[in-house]
Amino acid sequence: MWDMIKNFFLFSSGVLQATTLLLVILIFMYVRKTKKKNKESSGFMDDKH
């Protein structure tokens, strides 16, 4: 019983780490893309005010 629970936690934590890593990479790429766009249009923050 404990082995099953331990294995499940090891597996889920591994999946969680992989998912987090994937999310971080996706967000990083998205941020870089938007920053590039902002430089071209210039004044993204200025439009909000």
UniProtKB/Swiss-Prot annotation:
TM helices/strands, residue ranges: 8-28
Any Gene Ontology CC annotation: plasma membrane
The keyword Membrane is annotated on this UniProt entry: yes
Domain of life: Bacteria
Keywords: Cell membrane, Membrane, Transmembrane, Transmembrane helix
Membrane topology: Single-pass membrane protein
Main localisation: membrane
Compartments reported by the entry: Cell membrane
Protein name as catalogued: Uncharacterized membrane protein YyzH
